Every structure is written in structure tokens, then in C-alpha cells.
């Protein structure tokens, strides 16, 4: 296993996934890319973990920065090389596309990222990936 793609959104679930992916990366000497997907959905903005600004772009930027900061706080102490990539679109589709482009051997995601309402309306990224991805997917539970 040489390349791992990690889905991050700044949630506790994605940080738990980052811990597991980081340790796996260190143990295997693999390459790790943390991918944050900007997904514009009104319900997502209403449930954002940051103060919602009147400008959706500003809100998306704040969410992206939170994801970047929390991921760095988790991965940097492991002293592994990693990079952060931002994409826009459907999170499951974009994570699969990023993995395909990088010829990743594994996609790692947290089991929870959305609120209950968001999961009902948008579906679970981890569920969609496990059913449709063309490569192995590791879903890390929030403990």
C-alpha cells in the first residue's frame, strides 16, 4: 500500500479517521493526501461548525480552514509527509475521483461528519463510498 486518500471536513469523525490514516501512513511508509471537498448545500451551511457569514464563500472558506487546521493538528505530530487538497462538488464522488487520479490504494473516511438532518437529506459519504468506490474504503468509527 503506497498511497492513501483521507476525506476530511473538520468534524470529530474526520479527525478520528486522520489519526488512523496517519498511523497507517507512518507504519507503511505511504503517501497521504487529505482531501476536503467544498459541498454547497443550504442545509450544510445552516449546520456549519463555524459562524455562518452572509457570504456563502466566506462560510465555505471558514469551514475549509477549520478542516485544514484540525487535520494539521492531528497529522503534524506524527512527522509524516502529507498534503492537503481542496476540491468542489459531491464529497463521495470527489473523494473517489481524487483517489483515482492519485492511484490511491485506500480511501479513509470517518463514519460521521454530517448532522442527522444532513445525513437524511444528503446521504452518508462513507455509505456511498463503500457501495460505489472502485477501491478499498476504510470507515473509521467515532470512539
For each predicted feature, which ranges?
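Small/aliphatic-rich secondary-structure junction motif
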Residues: 2-53, 78-80, 102
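Short, acidic/small-residue loops that bind anionic groups at enzyme active sites
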Residues: 132-142
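Glycine-rich, Arg-bearing micro-motifs that act as flexible, cationic patches
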Residues: 106-131
